């Protein structure tokens, strides 16, 4: 892999900015390495990379890489071992951790952030890897194909199910509203071809917490009834976007 050539191709053929092309190349490298490594079945793809794959849009606005560990510990030593496994594949591209592994703690997410250096020996690109622990190890994950620049057939990886993605996204939308084009496209596709709403409902664990000022609803999140589909349309219609 030639990182500079991959970036130039995204700039030339897809119209990416240098910043977005660099981020996309790093994502392609990490996804490819993950698919080729022994860690493939212990990691699920989530976040913006997954949203773009599900919505069919390019990853122009997605800068970081979000992954969840499943049946794998979230210690510093384990994270370093994971990155080392991605680096030592003999494909001419190395991945190393730069600086300290950071703690991430937000309203509905806890995890670790790893700053990475991706190098082919000629060029070195920076990216960020956000790691979490999969909330339900017993829940079956989907297999999904991701487009990568240097592989015509793409790579197949485990990813959060459509129900899981929607449950997490619905929580976020109720708090913050729709903020990105991939989110909008995903919601539109969901309404055209919805997953199992009973499964989505079972994944919602809001405990009666009040929504934010944006997207005001009466009562706590736990009162929401997503069956039938018309109820969900009503919920979405009340989100302030």
Regions found by a protein language model. Name each.
Residues 1-43, 52-61, 65, 69-241:
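Structured mid-to-C-terminal alpha-helical surface segments
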